[in-house]
Amino acid sequence: MSAASPLRWQLTEHAPLRALNTFHVDATARWLLNIHAPEALPDALAAPQIAGQPLLVLGSGSNVLLAGDPPGCVLCFDNRDITIIAHHADHAIVRAGAGVNWHGLVMYSLQQGLSGLENLALIPGTVGACPIQNIGAYGAQVSDFIHVVEAYDRGSQQFVRMTPAECAFGYRDSVFKQQPDRYLIVAVEFNLPLLHELRLDYAGIRDELARMGAELAGAADVAQAVINIRQRKLPDPEVLGNAGSFFKNPLLPSEQIAALQASFADMPVFPGEQPGQGKLSAAWLIEQCGWKGKREGDAGISEAHALVLVNHGSASGAQLLAFARQVAESVRERYSVILEPEPRVIGAHW
């Protein structure tokens, strides 16, 4: 059964979600709300079938583990427009709808001669999801280039324009993650430079550029290098169900880092997000505990990258979650370091 306002929104009952999550686990939405025109949100949310119900927003389902059926209503944004709304001498403002494919936006910006997003190429997901996690990779994070986040505030029942400061961005964090039931992101405006200093901090990118023969690398070359690396390291979700990196790299006080290095001299440490803080490699910790390439039933860790939880076929969300908990517990027992998941876990507690 479905209800709709022509061309603006559609509501479907008992909708299967297997095709809407990259782990390819079975789950069912009591109601699935597709939003074609964001301005229709207030009317759609007032529909009697879903009014007052919990909402779960799914982009491409690439940052969620459905460990059970989500309560209430699942919402998908289908607005996929990209517009350059302002040109300046050294930068442009690009607006993208929440339903735009993230990698598609990265490639579009490069085709327009704009830079900034190249290190974030091939990250799965949609534009609407990118501010929630403050997605990042290879030394860059999306908050560095966000101009405004356009959202619907369910508290005030108003559309709002939020500056980066109001978004409270942190390492894989934001106000949208801290208050998941308040804001519905409908579009994002990006401030993208025509030229900027390339981020080549990671040796892997420099090595890949050398392999490509890109001696005077530009932003498009960096994007291609990132694509090459990610395709080698990360399994294609269409072939092997996964959500990319499943665990966050732990941020710890410098004193705890020093104590760990005293016991484990070969432990790699990276600069933290703040003074007095360091970052550990979750992949290294997991690999040292012997989990890389292991599996139980159809739940496992990728053979290529220890951060990637994979579904080899028919694992349920609950089975994947149980396996991930085993991995995290073994790291805690050996290193006294607590691993946290990057994806949002639905239907169970971490």
Swiss-Prot record:
Domain of life: Bacteria
All residue ranges annotated as the FAD-binding PCMH-type domain in the record: 24-195
EC number(s) recorded for this UniProt protein: 1.3.1.98
GO cellular component terms attached to this protein's record: cytosol
GO MF annotations in UniProt: FAD binding; UDP-N-acetylmuramate dehydrogenase activity
Pfam family, one: FAD_binding_4
Coiled-coil intervals, chain numbering: none
Enzyme kind, highest EC tier: oxidoreductase
Catalytic reaction equation(s): UDP-N-acetyl-alpha-D-muramate + NADP(+) = UDP-N-acetyl-3-O-(1-carboxyvinyl)-alpha-D-glucosamine + NADPH + H(+)
Subcellular localization, as worded in the UniProt entry: Cytoplasm
Keywords: Cell cycle, Cell division, Cell shape, Cell wall biogenesis/degradation, Cytoplasm, FAD, Flavoprotein, NADP, Oxidoreductase, Peptidoglycan synthesis
Chief place of localization: cytoplasm
Annotated pathway: Cell wall biogenesis; peptidoglycan biosynthesis
GO biological process: cell division; cell wall organization; peptidoglycan biosynthetic process; regulation of cell shape
CC cofactor: FAD
Residues forming the catalytic site: 172, 245 (proton donor), 342
PANTHER family: UDP-N-ACETYLENOLPYRUVOYLGLUCOSAMINE REDUCTASE
Function: Cell wall formation.
Family named by the database record: Belongs to the MurB family.
Protein name: UDP-N-acetylenolpyruvoylglucosamine reductase
Native source organism of the sequence: Xanthomonas campestris pv. campestris (strain B100)
